[in-house]
Amino acid sequence: MKMPENLEMPQEWTPEQKLFPHQVGFTCPPFDFDAAPTDFLRIAPPTVGVHGWMLHVPDYQHGLDQRKRNFGMLKDFAHCMGRNGVDACGQVGSNWVHASGLGVDGIREFCEKLSDEHGLAFHMAGYAMVEALRAMNVEKIALNAVYHWPDWWQGTAGFLEEAGFDVLWAGNFVDQGWFADQSAVNEQRWIFDGDLADKSFQYVAEKAPAADAYIVNGMCNFRTGQNGQPERMLHQTPRLETMLGKPVIAHDTALYWRMFKSLSVKPQGRHGQLLESL
């Protein structure tokens, strides 16, 4: 039996060939099981489909230098997602922007270049925070650095200052007095008691009462879910905003906001001022 000469699949995805009208891809930082695809999908309408791509660095130990050395993997991620019909990509991991050494404008240009090359909207968590704060007309901020190591959160504070924001106060759980040292924080593997979310933000608010907004870096988890299941800042934000009377913006909610904006889609439910501004 003679086989057809052309067995190639079409190179472009038409709208009729996509499983979902709006298709999204997220990175997962090496040595992590990230909740972003799950959290995003849970608040998205049924027209949205989500995929994840775990960055694979076998010897990864969370070093900023490792992020810089492996920054090129984001190009592979964008190429993979673009080739498979993804409309918007989200890079999870707030430290990658400052670890890259590209600066604020360099990161913006990097995101624009990947977007243009691969026919999608490419967003990084660290730069999404800048865009979110600007959209909310925020000038003065206080950074709750939660579990972040000192060189991590200091890099984040510097990146935000370079972007033009006035960082009134910044510090992590050790600076706030909840843990004796960074090793004790690391032992928790970024999952903390549920009541620490409120206590920590109350502390930061007392340190910087003049802040226009309180921000939190990274993807911190608190045991506030059913039977103590860990939950991200997405779940904490409405309660914290009610308690503090000001916007609370995290790198997870900032990234989701930016991706929903690119998709021209609104999230379902109430998840804080930023996401409800869409």
Model-flagged regions — what are they?
Residues M73-C80, D193-A208, D212, T224-P238:
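A short, acidic, amphipathic alpha-helical segment used as a generic capping/interface helix at domain edges
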